A protein has these predicted regions:
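A structure-centric signal for secondary-structure junctions around beta-strands
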Residues: 38-40, 60, 109-112
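Residue-level recognition of conserved beta-strand positions in structured domain cores
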Residues: 43, 68, 75-77, 103, ...
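Histidine-centered metal-chelating micro-motifs
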Residues: 51, 72, 81, 89-91, ...
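A short, N-terminal "cap"/entry segment at the start of jelly-roll beta-barrel domains
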Residues: 1-55
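A short beta-strand-loop-beta hairpin characteristic of the jelly-roll/cupin
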Residues: 57-87
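Conserved hydrophobic/aromatic beta-strand scaffold that supports enzyme active sites
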Residues: 41-45, 63, 82, 90-92, ...
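Ligand-binding loop in jelly-roll beta-barrel domains
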Residues: 86-87, 95-124
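Short secondary-structure boundary/capping segments
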Residues: 33, 55, 82-83, 91
Length: 125
């Protein structure tokens, strides 16, 4: 969902403006919104990037909230079914589960944006 003039969605400019720091890579863009009291809240944007071949493994519980678009979360373990989340959906990732997330469907026109809350300093690789 882009602006009427073809510009990026307003949510992007708001999130970028509020971010303490941002970083971009081949798997998306991440901006840290808050890091206090041992908790870090970040926004993640996925728009046509590659799917990360590595698995993410949170050391502690992570909470994801989809703001825009759809997000597919694949789990390494066949015991956990893959999930497709839409705007407004929340997913709790248990500590130690191995997963990866990407925009769904892969050829969607709009970016997927989600918020992630986790313990500060967690890398998950």
């Amino acid at each position: 969902m882009s602006g009427e003039d073809g510009s990026e969605p307003r949510v992007f400019s708001v999130l970028r403006g509020e971010a303490l720091r941002t970083r971009s890579g081949p798997f998306g863009e991440v901006g840290t919104l808050c890091s206090a009291g041992g908790i870090e809240v970040a926004w993640v944007s996925k728009h046509g990037e590659q799917v990360d071949p590595d698995w993410f493994r949170p050391d502690q519980v992570d909470v994801l909230l989809v703001v825009q678009g759809q997000l597919k979360v694949e789990f390494e373990s066949a015991a956990r079914p893959d999930r497709v989340l839409a705007a407004g959906d929340v997913l709790v990732l248990p500590a130690g589960c191995r997963c990866r997330a990407y925009r769904w469907p892969r050829d969607a026109a709009e970016a997927t944006i989600f918020l992630a809350a986790c313990p500060a300093g967690q890398d998950g690789r």
